[in-house]
Every structure is written in C-alpha cells, then in structure tokens.
C-alpha cells in the first residue's frame, strides 16, 4: 500500500503503461523524422545519379548528405526530449497520468500524502528516466527493474529521486 492508502502499481501494469507511452512517442518521432529522412535519402540518390565514372566526390557526399542527416537526427533528438518533457511533465501534471497510465488505471502521487504533485517532482522523474538514460548506459533498465526489489514502496529510481510512487486507481 502507498502512503496515501492506495494499492501500489505492479511491475506488469507499469511496464504496459510504459510501452503504451513509448508507442505514442515513436509515432511522434516517426512523424518528425520520416520526412527529413526521405528528403536526405532522395538527395543522396540524386548525388549518386550525378556522379561521374569514379563515383561521387566524398567531400560532396559528406557535406550534402551525411552532415544534413546528422543535423536532422540531432534536431529530432532535441525535439524528442522536448516532447518527453511536455508529455511526461506538463501533461502528467494535470492528473498524475500519461496516456499509458490512464489506460492502465495508474497514477503518479507524491510519497508524502499531504503534498501535491508538482512540476518539480515530475521534472526530476524526467531527468532520471530520460535525460539520465540517454547518457548513462543501461540506466533505463536499472531504473525500470529497481521496483522489483524496492521496499516498501516499489519505486523505480526516478520515483525515489522525485519522491513519488505509482498507484493503481481502478480495478
């Protein structure tokens, strides 16, 4: 039981909610990245068609294909971090739920029953789960599996850092 008396969310429910949220994020990412990818891809095909008998000039390929693709990937990465912030902090702040948590009938609540869920708490969750997970190898796995042995609140590392727990709000 959570400090507020609600039942704690189990690993399976949290994993399914995470997978639903990941599907939403992947749909957004594909909508952002595919047009850029096709633009660079067709540009690359055009470069190859214009190449002489010795093949394309490596410097030209580098500057007209690979650098724009790298810049596009960096841009998409930054947009995804912004999307994850909006989705997991701003959107979840209203009810303590993302779309995946709503579907699975889960809610993020503060460990302190008298505290309100704040942008700061959700921002800390985001920092550990997404920003930290980008830079520290295997942190995302360790973070998610942490709840399997955490007692008494079954918290993931991002929950511990933010002072939150995830509870079941429906049958």
Labelled PLM ranges:
Residues 36-48, 94-95, 99, 103, ...:
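Membrane-interfacial segments
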């Amino acid at each position: 039981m959570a400090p507020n008396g609600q039942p704690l969310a189990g690993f399976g429910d949290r994993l399914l909610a995470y997978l639903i949220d990941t599907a939403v994020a992947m749909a957004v990412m594909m909508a952002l990245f595919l047009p850029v990818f096709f633009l660079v891809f067709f540009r690359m095909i055009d470069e190859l068609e214009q190449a002489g008998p010795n093949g394309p000039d490596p410097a030209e390929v580098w500057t007209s294909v690979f650098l724009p693709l790298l810049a596009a990937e960096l841009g998409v990465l930054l947009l995804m971090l912004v999307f994850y912030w909006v989705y997991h902090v701003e959107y979840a702040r209203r009810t303590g739920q993302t779309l995946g948590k709503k579907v699975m009938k889960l809610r993020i609540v503060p460990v302190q029953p008298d505290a309100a869920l704040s942008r700061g708490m959700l921002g800390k969750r985001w920092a550990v789960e997404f920003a930290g997970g980008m830079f520290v190898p295997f942190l995302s796995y360790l973070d998610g599996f942490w709840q399997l042995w955490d007692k008494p609140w079954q918290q993931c590392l991002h929950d511990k850092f933010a002072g939150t727990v995830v509870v079941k709000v429906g049958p």
